Amino acid sequence: MKKKRPVLQDVADRVGVTKMTVSRFLRNPEQVSVALRGKIAAALDELGYIPNRAPDILSNATSRAIGVLLPSLTNQVFAEVLRGIESVTDAHGYQTMLAHYGYKPEMEQERLESMLSWNIDGLILTERTHTPRTLKMIEVAGIPVVELMDSKSPCLDIAVGFDNFEAARQMTTAIIARGHRHIAYLGARLDERTIIKQKGYEQAMLDAGLVPYSVMVEQSSSYSSGIELIRQARREYPQLDGVFCTNDDLAVGAAFECQRLGLKVPDDMAIAGFHGHDIGQVMEPRLASVLTPRERMGSIGAERLLARIRGESVTPKMLDLGFTLSPGGSI
């Protein structure tokens, strides 16, 4: 049986004020005298009071909650994006309502329907591919939406990210410039950004008069996936002398396999990844990677979303934060 929670009246009785005074303090402490603030705060702590958001939600007032839909909770990329988001939402008194959907648009639809039922004030997304019902629900909700991770694909409202195509093209060009000619693209998940990077890789190969070659798997990205992908690439493409991977997990796995086989990196095999994870930056040789502003992207995305919630105009609609090529020692 649930224990009865302290209510506003309990706090008011403890301090000797009206329930409305406590309510004003919870909404905005500045509306209450300095002398009362300390007393109310102490009473809240002593009683273990937990605010009830249901009345605000039912009255269509602000919930001070931001919905965040992520395709994965195990991917370090999104952990860092979330850290950036919450550095801003926490500072402004907003709660993040988090859900993940395993890169499945139908599951994203279910998660979104649940989130919207809580009257969230805004929504943060990281993918551009959605079901028709998801798009309709977002339209009907009429709340501000920010999409992260990509600054080029069409967005629903506003976006903060970087150019995945150009990042992949430039990294592939850097590998080619170091004398490698038989370069394969290793991809996992087959999500939209993986495909965009593949196109950037292919453009660089074609621009150099080289033949593009991709090895892709649908399962999630991991070190073991990187091992399996480079094994497959070497079987199917014996002259292989370089790989560009959709992220650092695959690249690190490929490096482990080269080490096992006694292949020298980069002399026998060039290896490059994406996102600049810490493990790749402490390897020897240091992994070449595209460094992306993940935490900054989350914080700026959250700042722009809160501005939209306040009714402010946000420009540009799509903000490109750029990327940095880090050649390391592996290409």
From Swiss-Prot:
Alphabetical list of SUPFAM superfamilies matching this protein: lambda repressor-like DNA-binding domains, Periplasmic binding protein-like I
Pfam families, alphabetized: LacI, Peripla_BP_1
Function comment: Negative regulator for the gluconate utilization system GNT-I, the gntUKR operon.
InterPro entries: Cro/C1-type_HTH (IPR001387), HTH_LacI (IPR000843), Lambda_DNA-bd_dom_sf (IPR010982), Peripla_BP/Lac1_sug-bd_dom (IPR001761), Peripla_BP_I (IPR028082)
Positions of the HTH lacI-type domain: 6-60
GO cellular-component term (any): cytosol
Pathway of action: Carbohydrate acid metabolism; D-gluconate degradation [regulation]
Organism this protein belongs to: Escherichia coli (strain K12)
GO biological process: DNA damage response; negative regulation of DNA-templated transcription; positive regulation of DNA-templated transcription; regulation of DNA-templated transcription
Disulfide bonds: none
Lineage: Bacteria, Pseudomonadati, Pseudomonadota, Gammaproteobacteria, Enterobacterales
Descriptive protein name: HTH-type transcriptional regulator GntR
Gene: gntR
SMART domains the UniProt entry points to: HTH_LACI
Signal peptide: none
